[in-house]
Amino acid sequence: MNRKILKLENLLRFHTICRQLHSLCQRRMLAQWRHMFSSAYAVHTAQLYTRPWQTDALLRAALSQRRLLVTKKEKRSQKSPLPSTKSKKEVEVWLGMTVEELARAMEKDIDCVYESLMNTAIDIDSLETHSRLDEVWIKEVIKKSGMKLKWSKLKQDKVRENKDAVKRPQADPALLIPRSPVVTIMGHVDHGKTTLLDKLRKTQVAAMEAGGITQHIGAFLVSLPSGEKITFLDTPGHAAFSAMRARGTQVTDIVILVVAADDGVMKQTVESIQHAKDAHVPIVLAINKCDKAEADPEKVKKELLAYDVVCEDYGGDVQAVHVSALTGENMMALAEATIALAEMLELKADPTGAVEGTVIESFTDKGRGPVTTAIIQRGTLRKGSILVAGKSWAKVRLMFDENGRAVNEAYPSMPVGIIGWRDLPSAGDEILEVESEPRAREVVDWRKYEQEQEKNKEDLKLIEEKRKEHQEAHRKDREKYGTVHWKERSYIKYREKRQQQPLKPKEKLERDSNVLPVIVKGDVDGSVEAILNVMDTYDASHECELDLVHFGVGDISENDVNLAETFHGVIYGFNVNAGNVIQQLAAKKGVKIKLHKIIYRLIEDLQEELSSRLPCIVEEHPIGEASILATFSITEGKKKVPVAGCRVQKGQIEKQKKFKLIRNGHVIWKGSLISLKHHKDDTSVVKTGMDCGLSLDEEKIEFKVGDAIICYEEKEVPAKTSWDPGF
C-alpha cells in the first residue's frame, strides 16, 4: 500500500516538473529533480532517482518525447536568422575597376580587397592600388565581403574615345606631283652594295664602315648628271640585320638586288628577294664584280630562276645590268635602268597638308638628344612642325641632310635627319604631323593607354592560365593523397617542401655560374634590334642561361655599370663609347665592358663568354696501346689474381696513368693497374715492342687473348657552347 501511495505522489511531482521543462535545460532539470527528491524523501532517494522512468515504460516514453521537443526548441532558438538577399548591401561596380575604386565603392579599406583575393590565382604581390581587376576577381571580392553586386550601366557602357592620329585620306589626283624614286640596295654581305653606292655618290662610305660591312640603314639623295634624283637606302647584308632589310622594303619603290658574279646567289640574297616580293616591290638586278676573271653573270641569272626572278634575257621583266662597283663600269646604265622603271611606275606624291613619313633609323646624340633619320612620304616638313611617331612626339628644332647640312624644308622622297624628339622613337615607326603640342601629347597618351590595355589583357590571360594550373595541381594532389593517411600525407608534403627550399650558398654559386646576365647598348635603335634578334636564336639554355637584363641606345652610363654589378653581368656595347670615368668605375666594381664595332665580333665574344661559364670537358688522350698475348693467374695470399701477358704495340704504358680494356671494339673496363712487371721486375714504364705482365684493380675482369689495353691520360679542356647564331 505504501508503495502505491509513494508511486502516486511521484507521478504528481513528475507532472509538476514537466511543466518546467519548457524553460530549463536538461542538466538543470536533472539537478533540480535530484535536489527535490533528496530533500523531501531522503530515505528513498536512490530508489526515487532511478525507478520512476527506468521501471515504468510509459513514463520513460513520455520523458523521452518531452526531452526531444525541448531540445528541438532550444536548437531552433539558438540558430541565427540567415541574412536575406534584400538585407545585403549593394555595391555598384563596372568593368576595369582598379583595386582602389573597388574599395571605395564597397566603403571598405583597400586591405579588405587584398584579403578577399588571398588564396586565389591572382598574384597579390604584384597587385597595386591602380591595378585593374578582371570581372572574375571583382565578383570574388564582392561575394567574400558578403555584399550584392550591381553593374553600373554608366561606367560599363562608357568607352574611352579614340584619340589616335591617323593618315589622311587619299589625295586629289590634281594635287599630286612627280617625286623621286626611293630605291633600296639589297643583297648578301660583302657583295659590294655600299661600294656600288659610293660610285654613284662619289664618296667613301664603305671605307668608313667598320670591317667593311654596312651596319645601319643609310639614306642618301643622289643627283645624277641627267638631273634626276634618286633616294637610296643602303641596307646591311649581314645575317643579323634581317629586320633592317625588311624595314627597308616597306618604304621603297624599287629594289636593286646586288649579286656578286663570282659568288652567286647566297642566303641573304634569297632573303632579300623574299622581302621584295612580300612588299610587292619590283627588282632591278645588278650583277657586281664583273671585272673579276672568275665572274660568271649567266650562272647568276640561271640560279635566280629558282627564286622566280626572271631576267629579260630569259623572257622575264627583271632588268639585269652587269656592273663593277670597283671600276665604275656600267654605273650610269644601272642608274638609267632605275629611272626608266620609276617612270613606268609613275611615282607621285602630295606635297601639301600634314606630313607623313617613316622612321628609318633612330639614335641618341650626346649634344642634340634623340635623333631620327626619316623618309618623307607626303606633305612638306618644316621647322616647328609637331610630329608623332609611335609613343614619342617632337617639335622640329632642326633638320639636316645626309651630309649634315641644315635644311629648312623636306619634300616627299627626301631623306632627312630630325632633331627635337622628346623620346626616342623606334625604327619603322610611322611619322604623322598633328596641329599642336597638346594634340601630340593626347595621341601619345592614347597610344600608351592602348598598350597598357593590351598588356592588361595579356596579364589576365596569364593569370587565368595560372589559375587553371593551380586548380589542376590541386586536383592531382587530391587524387594523389586522397587515400593516404593524414600523418603520411603531412610527411610527404613536408619532404616535397624541403626540396623546394632556397639553395644553399654553395649550390647557389654553382647555379649562378651557369647564368650570363648581359646589358646591351647600341648606337642606333636598329643595331640594338639586330643584336636582340640574334640573341633570340639562343637555344643552349640547358648549358648556360642567357639573361638579357637591359638594353638601350647610347653610350655606356653609370646606371649600366651599377645594373651590371647588381646582376653580376657583362656590358656589351656596339658602336658606342665608355668614358674614362665609366671604365674606372667598372674596373672598381669588377664589371666587364666589351665594346665592338663589328656585329659578328660581338656575337663571337658573347659565345666565348657563354663558353667560359660551362664546366670543363674531360678528354682522353691515348699514351700507349698493348695487345694481350696470354692469360694466367698468380696466387697472392689466399686468392688468385688474373694476369695478362702483353706486348706494347704503340707508344708506352705508364703505371700511374688510366687504363681501359677493349674487346671487339667495346670498352669492358676502365680503371688503374695494381701491378706492372717486365719479366719479373716491377716497372713504371714499358715502351713499344717490350713484353709485360699486368693486373687490374678489379679482380672479376677476365682477360682474353686478343684484347687491347689502352693507356691514356685525362685532360680538362674548356667547353664550347653549342649555340650557333647562324653566321
UniProtKB/Swiss-Prot annotation:
Primary localisation category: mitochondrion
Chain spans, region G3:
234-237
- Which superkingdom does the taxonomy of this entry point to? Eukaryota
Sequence positions that bind GTP: 187-194, 234-237, 288-291
Looking at the record, which segments are called G2?
Answer: 212-216
Q: Which UniProt keywords apply?
A: GTP-binding, Initiation factor, Mitochondrion, Nucleotide-binding, Phosphoprotein, Protein biosynthesis, Transit peptide
Q: Which GO terms describe its biological process?
A: mitochondrial translational initiation; ribosome disassembly
Of the GO CC terms on this record, one is: mitochondrial matrix
Q: Where is this region: G4?
A: 288-291
Q: Where does it localize?
A: Mitochondrion
Q: Which GO terms describe its molecular function?
A: GTP binding; GTPase activity; ribosomal small subunit binding; translation factor activity, RNA binding; translation initiation factor activity
Spans annotated as G5: 324-326
Q: What does this protein do?
A: One of the essential components for the initiation of protein synthesis. Protects formylmethionyl-tRNA from spontaneous hydrolysis and promotes its binding to the 30S ribosomal subunits. Also involved in the hydrolysis of GTP during the formation of the 70S ribosomal complex.
Q: How does it assemble?
A: Monomer.
Q: What is the designated name of this protein? A: Translation initiation factor IF-2, mitochondrial
Organism field: Bos taurus (Bovine)
